[in-house]
């Protein structure tokens, strides 16, 4: 077996997947190279071609298959891996006693929203122990913005007897810096929640491989 392939695998077993570079992770996924190109070289070529791991994971079938060394089989495997990750995060949130750890909500929102090509506004509804009741993509917009109606969020929260909410939306541009309208919306949502006794936990803006948390900003 190709030693170049084994090196990332051995590194993963010794130090965990988080110790691997994007190139090494992709090499494990690809398993083998192509004629005249070892798998580590191929994985770097693929990353260079797409610009980032995120762009690779977000590519449609036609774009994906235009890259040398990639085909329909790899595309199917990648989509299945992405979906398993989403479901794992959702199930983690369902079985945990609460969502007191901010990173868990962030990871779930990133998995759901990072690859969206238009703005999507999503809400997590929690009970009084911060356990997830449900999560829902409530508003869809254009590449620049999504129109959000606080009253609809409150109506849904009351309908499912939520004691708290966490909201998030993505910036398709990749820049997670909140706009003035994002800040204004956050204030409106906080006020609307306060009026009906629902706790507003956080508003998270999802970018490319990064995020902004209004709650975390208070402690900076």
Swiss-Prot record:
GO molecular function, one term: metallopeptidase activity
Positions of short motif JAMM motif: 169-182
Domain of life according to the entry: Bacteria
Keyword Transferase: no
InterPro entries: MPN, RadC_JAB, RuvA_2-like, UPF0758, UPF0758_CS, UPF0758_N
A biological process from GO: proteolysis
Sequence ranges assigned to domain MPN in this UniProt record: 98-220
Record's keyword terms, sorted: Hydrolase, Metal-binding, Metalloprotease, Protease, Zinc
Residues at which Zn(2+) binds: 169, 171, 182
Record-linked PANTHER family: DNA REPAIR PROTEIN RADC (PTHR30471), UPF0758 PROTEIN YEES-RELATED (PTHR30471:SF3)
Assigned protein family: Belongs to the UPF0758 family.
Protein name, UniProt field: UPF0758 protein APL_1970
